[in-house]
Amino acid sequence: MKNKTEVKNGGEKKNSKKVSKEESAKEKNEKMKIVKNLIDKGKKSGSLTYKEIMDELQEVDLGPEQIEKIYEVLESVGVDVVGDMHEIEVEEEDLDLTIPEGIAIDDPVRMYLKEIGKVPLLSPEEEIDLAQRIKNGDRSARKKLAEANLRLVVSIAKRYVGRGMLFLDLIQEGNLGLIKAVEKFDFKKGFKFSTYATWWIRQAITRAIADQARTIRIPVHMVETINKLIRVSRQLLQELGREPQPEEIAKIMDMPVDKVREIMKIAQEPVSLETPIGEEEDSHLGDFIPDDEAPAPADAAAFRMLKEQLLKILNTLTPREEKVLRLRFGLDDGRARTLEEVGKEFNVTRERIRQIEAKALRKLRHPSRSKKLKDYLD
């Protein structure tokens, strides 16, 4: 028969699964709503630009594969997805490889930025030619298309500096997204490669930040929820002129107050015990946090002195009496033995051990011995 603890734990697990399913259903409904809005908007104008789609999808956590499916759904209902060429050309012209402020950077990274700056940008015709060759299995074309867009990765990675990952790591993660974009690019859809690759690069970087930037990993969907909560908090701060209450945030986000409090708790960054303290930073936070499990120095010293006095008093008994008391009260290993167990140790009856114990305790109660221990009992 299950005990109460098992029943309680089972109930908690069921509740946890129920909450998880509710969150999943809510996220799914939110995604479906956004897709429906895109379809309605696209049918009115006949087409959608990449930027319009990305602006709508920015609020939800979608993988690149899911984005591909949304493109297919839009095209299946007669909505053309087109590239905003003017916008992308401006973006490419604005790409810069300068190092962000406050970023310590060594010579190898400087050399990398210098090298990728030498690679010329591709024209739309060159991109189409390379894409066709990639489709036919040309590995050199794949390499050339990726190298020509490395500066795009650096430009995007700069926007995510200060979120818990090194600049070089952000570039590396963005490069992985770029490689994926090279493999998936379909020039027949009409937009430039940089338009298409931007999403993959951003997605790779944001997922890496979610997975690696925190000491305790938080799932990607929760990172998105935390970001949304932060945006709502900032908006309310500007409107109210003070820090918003959880109840006010919950109303805007359309979720229970307890859930908002839970998200706020999850969003807190852990603080290292090695955090430097003071102007000279010669102390650490851990130096000022007491160990609740460790005894106070005064108590530890008193216990040690009591132990020394107890050993001296036990030495005044006969060897047999001393050993019986040590076993009966577990003075050596913390495990008290029964009369039966001690009797087997000495090969005598329980009654005999009881008599030896009683005699030894009478001796310890004598004022000549007991007065030495009384001070430790106050």
UniProtKB/Swiss-Prot annotation:
Keywords on record: Cytoplasm, DNA-binding, Sigma factor, Transcription, Transcription regulation
Region of interest called Sigma-70 factor domain-4, as start-end residue ranges on this chain: 313-366
Motif (Interaction with polymerase core subunit RpoC): 169-172
SUPFAM superfamilies noted in UniProt: Sigma2 domain of RNA polymerase sigma factors, Sigma3 and sigma4 domains of RNA polymerase sigma factors
Pfam families, per database record: Sigma70_r1_1 (PF03979), Sigma70_r1_2 (PF00140), Sigma70_r2 (PF04542), Sigma70_r3 (PF04539), Sigma70_r4 (PF04545)
Residues in the DNA-binding region annotation: 339-358
GO-annotated biological processes: DNA-templated transcription initiation
Keyword Hydrolase among record annotations: no
GO CC annotation: cytoplasm
Domain of life assignment: Bacteria
Keyword hit for Hydrolase: no
Cell compartment(s), UniProt: Cytoplasm
Molecular function (Gene Ontology), one example: DNA binding
Region (Sigma-70 factor domain-3): 224-300
Gene3D superfamilies from the UniProt entry: RNA Polymerase Primary Sigma Factor (1.10.601.10), Sigma-70 factor, region 1.1 (1.10.220.120), Winged helix-like DNA-binding domain superfamily/Winged helix DNA-binding domain (1.10.10.10)
Region (Disordered): 1-29
Signal peptide boundaries: none
Region of interest called Sigma-70 factor domain-2, as start-end residue ranges on this chain: 145-215
Family, per entry: Belongs to the sigma-70 factor family. RpoD/SigA subfamily.
Oligomer status and interactors: Interacts transiently with the RNA polymerase catalytic core.
Function: Sigma factors are initiation factors that promote the attachment of RNA polymerase to specific initiation sites and are then released. This sigma factor is the primary sigma factor during exponential growth.
Record protein name field: RNA polymerase sigma factor SigA
